[in-house]
Amino acid sequence: MNSRVFNFGAGPAMLPEEILKEAQEEFLNWRNTGMSILEIGHRTPEIISLLSTAEQSLRELLNIPKNYHVLFLGGAARAQFAMIPMNLLRPGDDAAYFITGIWSKMAYHEANLLKKAYYLSSEEKEGFVSIPDYQKWELKSNTAYVYYTPNETINGVRFPYVPKTEGVPLVADMTSCLLSEPINIRQYGLIFAGAQKNIANAGLTVVIIHEELLQNQPEPVIPTMLNYKNHADHRSLYATPPVFNCYLASKMFEWIKKQGGIEELFQRNCLKAAKLYQYLDSTDFYLTPVSKEARSIMNVCFSLYYPDLEQKFLDMANERGLKALKGHRFTGGLRASLYNAMPMAGVDALIEFMSEFAKENG
């Protein structure tokens, strides 16, 4: 197959074709340096300028106040499951967690392994198909932060609200939703996101952290590479950053601006998800486990009424250029991820195929 396909993968995800073409054109000789972006030293003026431009673009998109630091860190977002408690919990502190899916469950267990954590609510017994009703939760007096995952990539559930924390810093794993919908940064103490959904290619984690959370040095002492303050003090240059990822992220930030900004993309994302859910709700051939009020806009999880047809569905979808629809290995089933770069044409093509498949196999 020579043409581009529709990649519904949860990550690495689809990137805008125009960005890929720009990167291709610049690959051998970036900004007339005679070198590829992959070859340029990270402390050169060119790369320092690139990081500064990327940070400023992200600040403009999200209206990030000056008292928040933006960090571009190498590695998987999953590393934050350990870095957050190691940096934010001091002796005698507790952390509170909402367990609403696989990723928040993993984060909770990692925090408990290293420090002390408790959960405010767990939806595991119900199968991670809903979000706890909004209420005033009782926080322990020694709670240093409250952690939640606004969008659970694996389970396809989304918080329809921002939890109230009574002044306790709110920490959010926004790996699969950052830049897909408007947020108020001031409601959070720390936000992190892996890049491979809506930001860039895999290997970069963006952290946005309030300066007050950097004031107290961790106790006991932690490795220097895991200390947020070290990265903030060195403007993401404490060690070699993932330069190519930051380069793509900078292009992605500018692409979002050209599309009309985050609000415009949010409207598109809502329309894409609504169209797919509307089709799923119209047929008994496909099943959607998540309660309607908790459905993700980014990750639409579903299954077949006849599960033995799943592999046939995936094989035929692949032949139609509809890729990566297999659900996560922890949950099974099917999943269509509708990140910013997925056009409505991709959703239309998927619905057309699903309708034909249901008629032929129902």
Swiss-Prot record:
InterPro entries: Aminotrans_V_dom, Aminotrans_V_PyrdxlP_BS, Pser_aminoTfrase, PyrdxlP-dep_Trfase, PyrdxlP-dep_Trfase_major, PyrdxlP-dep_Trfase_small. Keywords: Amino-acid biosynthesis, Aminotransferase, Cytoplasm, Pyridoxal phosphate, Pyridoxine biosynthesis, Serine biosynthesis, Transferase. It catalyses: O-phospho-L-serine + 2-oxoglutarate = 3-phosphooxypyruvate + L-glutamate; 4-(phosphooxy)-L-threonine + 2-oxoglutarate = (R)-3-hydroxy-2-oxo-4-phosphooxybutanoate + L-glutamate. It is found in: Cytoplasm. One of its GO terms (molecular function) is O-phospho-L-serine:2-oxoglutarate aminotransferase activity. Its EC number is 2.6.1.52. It comes from the Bacteria. Binds 1 pyridoxal phosphate per subunit. The keyword Amino-acid biosynthesis applies. Its cofactor is pyridoxal 5'-phosphate. GO terms for biological process: L-serine biosynthetic process; pyridoxine biosynthetic process. L-glutamate binds at residue 43. Pathway: Amino-acid biosynthesis; L-serine biosynthesis; L-serine from 3-phospho-D-glycerate: step 2/3; Cofactor biosynthesis; pyridoxine 5'-phosphate biosynthesis; pyridoxine 5'-phosphate from D-erythrose 4-phosphate: step 3/5. The modification N6-(pyridoxal phosphate)lysine is found at residue 197. One of its GO terms (cellular component) is cytoplasm. Pyridoxal 5'-phosphate binds at residues 77-78, 103, 153, 173, 196. Gene3D superfamilies: Aspartate Aminotransferase, domain 1, Type I PLP-dependent aspartate aminotransferase-like (Major domain). HAMAP family: SerC_aminotrans_5. Catalyzes the reversible conversion of 3-phosphohydroxypyruvate to phosphoserine and of 3-hydroxy-2-oxo-4-phosphonooxybutanoate to phosphohydroxythreonine. Homodimer. Belongs to the class-V pyridoxal-phosphate-dependent aminotransferase family. SerC subfamily. This is Phosphoserine aminotransferase. It comes from Legionella pneumophila subsp. pneumophila (strain Philadelphia 1 / ATCC 33152 / DSM 7513). The gene is serC.
